[in-house]
């Protein structure tokens, strides 16, 4: 079950934490385009176009995919869940 450890966190806090991870500790913006984050990199998929769901993002971030490195052990489970939440919502906007 995702977000099990984040039950006390509001949706806004989760979104903001996810954006912070996307831009900073996860360094996602270095490779992925996502309008909400102001990132326009095109090394990885354009997240605005593919609009990945939360589970797909969690799997990709944890395990890596293609040239994207696995972030399990680098990011905490909470950070992975937050960035997945943020990315799935921001990509829909």
Each language-model region and where it sits:
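C-terminal capping alpha-helices of c-type cytochrome domains
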Residues: 61, 74-93
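Gly/Gly-Pro-rich "capping" loops immediately C-terminal to redox-active cysteine motifs
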Residues: 19-20, 29-65, 70, 74
